[in-house]
Each structure stands twice: as C-alpha cells, then as structure tokens.
Amino acid sequence: MPELPEVEVVRRGIASGLEGRKIAGLTVRNPNLRWPVPELERTLCGLEIRTVTRRGKYLLLDCGAGTLILHLGMSGSLRLLALAANIAPQKHDHIDLLLDKGMVLRFRDPRRFGAVLWTTGNATDHPLLSHLGPEPLTEAFDGKLLYSKTRNRSASIKEVLMNSRIVVGVGNIYANEALFLAGIDPANAAGRIGARRCAGLAQAIKETLGRAIEAGGSSLRDFVGSDGNPGYFQQQYWVYSRTGQPCRKCGTNIEQIRQGQRSSFYCPRCQK
C-alpha cells in the first residue's frame, strides 16, 4: 500500500497540472471501488481545482464548492495525461477526470481498494479524516508530543507508530526504518520509551519520510509516480525486508519478527 511518501510524491507530481484547471467531465468505467463512486459529473463540471493537498494518505482536491477526496488504496496510481496523446485506457483504468485544455487525470486501481469521494463540508471533518493525528513532517509532531502520546501504553512502539490517531502516514516500511535510525527495538513497549529517545525517534521519522519523498517513494510492487516512473527508496533500506542480510552499520544479520499482522525487521545489535 502506498504510504505517506508515495502519496506526497503523487501530490507533488500532479499539483501544478491540476491547480487552476477547470473540470470538464468525469468518466467512470467501474464505480465499484472500496466505496461506490458517487454520481458526480453534473456536480463537478465547471468547477475549478484550487489546490491539491494531502492529509495522511488522502489527496484533497479543493474545488471551492466542495472537495474531492482520493485514496490510492493498495495499488492505485494517478497520471496526468494529454488527450492529444490518445493513450487508450487499460483494464484497470477505472476513472478519468477530464480537465480543460485537453488534459485528463487518470485513476488506475487494479485491486479496487481505492476511493473517490466528494464532500461539501470541511474535508478534514470528513469521517475518514477527522480522527487522524498530526502530520509527521510538520512542527505539530515532535518528541514531546510522541512522549505524551505513548505514556502508559503497553503496546509495542512499532504498533503505536502505525496508529493513525497518534501520527499519520507512518506505515510498516517507514516505521521499521525510523526505529532503526533511532536505535529502538520495535518490540519495546511504547510506554517505556523515555523522553530523550522519543525526541530521537520523532526526528528519525521526519528524516526517513523526507529521504523517501526525495527518492520518489518505495516501489516494491505496483507503485509508480504520476510520471509513470518507480521510486527508488527501497535501494536505501536499512532493515526493511533485509532478513538475514548484514546490517549496513555493524554487520550483524538483520532479524525478522511478527507483530500483529505485520513483519518487523531490526538489527539486534544496533536496536535496544
């Protein structure tokens, strides 16, 4: 599933091509995504896309009269195409958002876990977004906040990091990578992590996500950016999916454990 860096890469890739453009139409080839796509063509036609922002793993297209909420699901992608290029839709290209000046935003979703929703209220108050915690790349998220949110929690620190009510967008890949940078064993109880180590972990999260965005995200299976190219952050992984390989810092073999429904990867020497 695309995590925060991948969604931010997509946002940056499409924002300049969407902002200021008017919507000319909507083609829905398959409405059966995670939630059925509502009838929106009459509502959207003529509206101008003012801004393209991100909240967690959701993309928000502010159209003035309302906001289009997009989620890429497990394997979705967005591409901004010129109609003149005459690129025929493929099997899993379920939705085209037609724009003025001969452009189209094409939503591809092979596994159909994505979403295209519309709200006329404040987008951040939508039931899918209202519970979300702070954005990790903003000043609202720091070591003090992480320390306060982890007190009296017996769950593992990795599981807590992946709780979107604590902080948004830190999925399995980036939780593993940030914990390595911070030198923290993923199985440690969150409530036992001290203030100093929480500060280091918050900084490691910011650094990891920032580096991933600059590398175009991670492409392990399906992810491609809006230009159709894969990301390259997987080439920089410290621990994720490197079971049995030597730690890039100390040479100790990376180990793998199961936490909930997810695999965790760590260096038993570097992470305590």
Curated annotation (Swiss-Prot):
Organism of provenance: Nitrosospira multiformis (strain ATCC 25196 / NCIMB 11849 / C 71)
Subunit relationships: Monomer.
A Pfam family this chain is assigned to: zf-FPG_IleRS
Annotated CDD domains: EcFpg-like_N
Textual note on the cofactor: Binds 1 zinc ion per subunit.
Gene Ontology biological process terms from the UniProt entry: base-excision repair
HAMAP family found in the cross-reference section: Fapy_DNA_glycosyl
Keywords, comma-separated and alphabetical: DNA damage, DNA repair, DNA-binding, Glycosidase, Hydrolase, Lyase, Metal-binding, Multifunctional enzyme, Zinc, Zinc-finger
Similarity field: Belongs to the FPG family.
Reaction equations catalysed: Hydrolysis of DNA containing ring-opened 7-methylguanine residues, releasing 2,6-diamino-4-hydroxy-5-(N-methyl)formamidopyrimidine; 2'-deoxyribonucleotide-(2'-deoxyribose 5'-phosphate)-2'-deoxyribonucleotide-DNA = a 3'-end 2'-deoxyribonucleotide-(2,3-dehydro-2,3-deoxyribose 5'-phosphate)-DNA + a 5'-end 5'-phospho-2'-deoxyribonucleoside-DNA + H(+)
Binding site for DNA: 92, 111, 153
Positions annotated as active site in the UniProt record: 2 (schiff-base intermediate with dna), 3 (proton donor), 57 (proton donor), 262 (proton donor)
Record carries keyword ATP-binding: no
SUPFAM superfamilies: Glucocorticoid receptor-like (DNA-binding domain), N-terminal domain of MutM-like DNA repair proteins, S13-like H2TH domain
Protein name per its UniProtKB record: Formamidopyrimidine-DNA glycosylase
